[in-house]
């Protein structure tokens, strides 16, 4: 008899149960770079599937890097698919805001925090929906007030 078992919850198994298997193989050997590449592939797939043409890989990578470490492919797929699928079809950049919210638990409204997270003024405009000129002015005023 050959029994093959797979799980994402290996660490929750009792050691006595694990000893009953002749072999235990760990396939979770993804580097963070591998996981970023996988997340980009999922993004491309879902943008095509949901007919969203606007893509900014640099911004996508910055948002994804807020997750440390990046989750494994199954979780990446769900995260990206949900952000794209439930985004506003009339706003091709809405999935960035949804992705940011899902990852941070916060709406991308605090422009100072976005700047601290190394987003550019253009990227802050996309995430916050505040015009670039207003973002630049507010950031300048914050610096002058310090």
What are these regions (language model features)?
Residues 101-119:
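Short, amphipathic alpha-helical "recognition" segments used to contact nucleic acids or chromatin
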Residues 49-103:
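Conserved AAA+ ATPase small/helical "lid" subdomain
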Residues 72, 131-136:
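Short coil turns linking two alpha-helices in DNA-binding domains
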Residues 8-9:
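Conserved H-loop
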Residues 123-126:
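Short alpha-helical "recognition helix" segments of helix-turn-helix
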Residues 1-2, 14-49, 78-79:
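Conserved AAA+ ATPase core "coupling" helix
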Residues 80, 128, 139-140:
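DNA major-groove recognition helix of helix-turn-helix
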Residues 135-146:
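Short, solvent-exposed alpha-helical "recognition" segments
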């Amino acid at each position: 008899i050959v029994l093959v078992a797979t799980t994402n919850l290996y660490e929750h198994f009792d050691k006595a149960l694990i000893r009953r298997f002749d072999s235990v193989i760990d396939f979770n050997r993804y580097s963070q770079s591998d996981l970023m590449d996988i997340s980009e592939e999922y993004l491309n797939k879902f943008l095509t599937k949901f007919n969203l043409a606007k893509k900014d890989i640099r911004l996508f990578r910055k948002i994804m890097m807020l997750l440390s470490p990046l989750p494994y492919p199954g979780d990446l797929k769900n995260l990206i698919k949900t952000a794209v699928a439930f985004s506003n079809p009339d706003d091709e950049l809405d999935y960035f805001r949804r992705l940011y919210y899902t990852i941070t638990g916060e709406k991308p409204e605090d422009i100072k925090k976005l700047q601290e997270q190394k987003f550019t003024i253009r990227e802050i405009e996309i995430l916050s929906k505040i015009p670039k000129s207003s973002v630049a002015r507010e950031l300048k005023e914050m610096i002058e007030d310090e």
